[in-house]
Each structure stands twice: as C-alpha cells, then as structure tokens.
Amino acid sequence: MLNTLLVVGFGGFIGAILRMFSINLVNKFFPYSISLGTLFVNVLGSFIIGLLFSYAQNKGLSPLLKSFISTGFLGAFTTFSTFSYQNLLLLQSGNYLHFALNIILNVFLCLFAAWLGFIIFK
C-alpha cells in the first residue's frame, strides 16, 4: 500500500509540474479568452488515458504503473476544477459565446481524444 501511495504521489508531482508548464506555454502563444492551455492538457490527458487503458486491456500493465499514470500523473495533469472556474469567470463576465464554446470544445475534444487513444491498441 505504501508503494502505491508513493507512486501515485510521484506521478501527481510530475503531472502538476507538467500541467503548469504546458498551460503557461500554450497560453503564452495563444492568449485568448478561452484557456487553450487548459483545453490542451485536458485533450492530451484524455488521449493518454485512452491509450493507457486500451494498452492495459490488450497487453497488461502492472497495477502500480497504472496507478502512477492514471491516478497520479493524469490526475494532476488534467484539471476539471480549473476548467470549471474558467467557465464560471466567462459566465460572470457575460461572455456567453466563449463560455459555450469552451464547454463544447473541452467535452467533445476530450471524449474524441480518449476514444482515439483507446482504439490505437485495439
């Protein structure tokens, strides 16, 4: 159990740092009302989790590695709480078009990315 906790914690540490750098980098080059950095990490994280579970079903993956990637790394790399807060700010500012667009893009692109990642190892 202690090994799992340490592995998840280390994965979370790496995921959180990469999320911060990724969001800042993308938003630096694409400074729009919608945080494309958050969209990027959510889509990429959805793709990676699709790959992970498809690979695990077909080839097998140790429970420790699965915990490291899915719970640790991806749990910290992707961010629904930031997504929710950003949407709240768009809604409060009356920016309804960007509010709707941000929700639609995040939900559909993340679902598509997870599906795409999943079918790669099918």
Swiss-Prot record:
<comment type="function">
    <text>Fluoride-specific ion channel. Important for reducing fluoride concentration in the cell, thus reducing its toxicity.</text>
</comment>
<keyword id="KW-0997">Cell inner membrane</keyword>
<feature type="transmembrane region" description="Helical">
    <location>
        <begin position="60"/>
        <end position="80"/>
    </location>
</feature>
<keyword id="KW-0406">Ion transport</keyword>
<feature type="binding site">
    <location>
        <position position="75"/>
    </location>
    <ligand>
        <name>Na(+)</name>
    </ligand>
</feature>
<keyword id="KW-0915">Sodium</keyword>
<protein>
    <recommendedName>
        <fullName>Fluoride-specific ion channel FluC</fullName>
    </recommendedName>
</protein>
<dbReference type="Pfam" id="PF02537">
    <property type="entry name" value="CRCB"/>
</dbReference>
<keyword id="KW-0812">Transmembrane</keyword>
<feature type="binding site">
    <location>
        <position position="78"/>
    </location>
    <ligand>
        <name>Na(+)</name>
    </ligand>
</feature>
<dbReference type="InterPro" id="IPR003691">
    <property type="entry name" value="FluC"/>
</dbReference>
<feature type="transmembrane region" description="Helical">
    <location>
        <begin position="6"/>
        <end position="26"/>
    </location>
</feature>
<keyword id="KW-0479">Metal-binding</keyword>
<dbReference type="GO" id="GO:0046872">
    <property type="term" value="F:metal ion binding"/>
</dbReference>
<dbReference type="GO" id="GO:0062054">
    <property type="term" value="F:fluoride channel activity"/>
</dbReference>
<keyword id="KW-1003">Cell membrane</keyword>
<feature type="transmembrane region" description="Helical">
    <location>
        <begin position="101"/>
        <end position="121"/>
    </location>
</feature>
<dbReference type="GO" id="GO:0140114">
    <property type="term" value="P:cellular detoxification of fluoride"/>
</dbReference>
<dbReference type="GO" id="GO:0005886">
    <property type="term" value="C:plasma membrane"/>
</dbReference>
<feature type="transmembrane region" description="Helical">
    <location>
        <begin position="33"/>
        <end position="53"/>
    </location>
</feature>
<keyword id="KW-0813">Transport</keyword>
<comment type="similarity">
    <text>Belongs to the fluoride channel Fluc/FEX (TC 1.A.43) family.</text>
</comment>
<keyword id="KW-0472">Membrane</keyword>
<keyword id="KW-0407">Ion channel</keyword>
<keyword id="KW-1133">Transmembrane helix</keyword>
